[in-house]
Amino acid sequence: MLAGGIKNKIMKYYKGINDAEYGFQAQVDFGDEKLLKKDIYKEVEFSFIDSINYVKTKVKTDVLDIGSLSFHGLLVSEKFYSICERFDSHQVQFVDIIGDENLKGYKFMFFNGDLTTKIDYRKTNFILCENMLDEFEVLNENLEPSRKNMINIDKEICSVDIFKQLIPKNGFSFIEGFDINKYNIFRIGHFDEHFYFSEKVVKALKAENITGITFVESVNFSPFTHC
């Protein structure tokens, strides 16, 4: 807390999203069960990945769209990695890609963190919305304020209907003693699977003309009503 009891301001965060214009630029061998069935919230125990291959007909960018693995993280170039390494992150793990000379220097950037335990559910006003082409309709704004309930709603409703979303109407509030500002790269988890980058990281990446990724400012860290 700052003097006078004013709450620390949360800095701007951006969602990192693969550029759709390039299509799938890399693929995983179907036989690699340990990779394809990885627990999203656990670190991998292997030090390299040899089952990812570059699609030679595609444009090579700093961040490559890998389709089936995109849920776990990002396939990034050495330049992208070296920039991110300068900033504090929450349970982000980089693993070397080997075997394909076209991917020399690339790493897979796993987002293993779960910050849903750090959210203050009574202060965070979660609502269930339907988002059809950015036209929001509130379906339920009287949700039981608990982590268990939010995860269940995400699993039973949102995961089976891509247009339904759980949204923190006035932005995330976090439990006392936890400061989200100390992390520049992270994922919330469960009902929010986006990959978040702070404004400082985004500026550093853009200064180096990083390609293959789009950054969209997230309203989930804003105190203003957005649904």
Task: Give names to the regions the model predicted.
Residues 2-74, 78-227:
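Phosphate/anion-contacting hairpin/loop surfaces
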